[in-house]
Amino acid sequence: MPPANPRTKPKALNYALKFARGSLATIYDAEDWPAPDQLRVAAAALAANPELACVQAPLECYNGGDNWITRAFALEYAIHFHLWLPLLVRLGLPIPLGGTSNHFVVSKLRAAGAWDPFNVTEDADLGFRLAAQGWRCGMIAPPTLEEATTNRADWTRQRSRWIKGYMQTLLVRARPRETGAGAAGALSLCATLGAGVLSAFLYAPALALLAGWAIGAAAGVWPAPPLWAYALPLLVWAIAAASAIPAARRARAPALLRAALWQPIYWLFQTPAAAWALMQLIRRPHFWEKTEHGAADRRPR
């Protein structure tokens, strides 16, 4: 494509959309392994429901067993794509689309303005923008296999871009006229992107504060923390662990359940990624932090 800023994936997608001649369009990443019947199932779902502008296929990681990071990443995907997004769809709420395996009705995609070229999570933004136009996004069953990041450096680069994009989407979509779908759209926006960004910033500092408070109390420096201060993180961990059971079953990957044991440690990585995302939002808001691929120990069969 011709060189032009911003040099982002959505900018390239908008350029390619000009040449689309069909009634449907699908987005795949180069390293994806979609299920053989996914395109047919997506086309049938879109044809059967005129309210749908897009359907999202669940994303699963083919290298979830490489190491503890990939296993936690794969479990995170399983919960998101097999539990959380289907729940939002059943409730009739807008969903943040994933960055791949989106199947669109081209006329509705164009009517919504296609992708925001300045947003580095153009997929999440587009899900809410389609809802603002009165259309819905659905889920289909055939999955797409993709590669989980295999080390912390790659994970942080990818996650910081996601968090930066979520903040961009919140800054734009949180305006009253932009949320889409009224109170339902605002609820979904806050419960998905808003809660994710907030927890990324607060999780590690909150645990550090609680640990310092408990240590100081044990030394007699100050009173002990109230019981709810201990109960709250335990409740969050318990909910995540309980969610892992049906998510791993639906992803046909029972081995992912082990990752529930170290998810509380895995979540600590979110805070430095969030700090890096905030710095980039201020200094390099449209810079695309690329993710390295090809490091997986295994490939789909």
Regions found by a protein language model. Name each.
Residues G127-L145:
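Catalytic donor-sugar/metal-binding loop of nucleotide-sugar-dependent glycosyltransferases
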Residues G99, G138-M139, L145-R157:
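Catalytic cores of eukaryotic secretory-pathway lumenal/extracellular enzymes that build
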Residues P2-S23, P36-V120, S160-L171:
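Long helical/loop segments within the catalytic core of UDP-sugar-dependent glycosyltransferases
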Residues D29-W33, W115-F118, L130:
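The conserved acidic donor/metal-binding loop of glycosyltransferases
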Residues T150, T156-L193:
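Active-site-adjacent helix/loop segment of glycosyltransferases
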Residues Q158, W162-L170, R258-P300:
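Membrane-proximal soluble regions of multi-pass membrane proteins
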Residues T192-R284:
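Membrane-embedded multi-pass helical conduit in multi-pass membrane proteins
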Residues V120-L126:
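Acidic donor-binding loop at a coil-to-helix junction in glycosyltransferase catalytic cores
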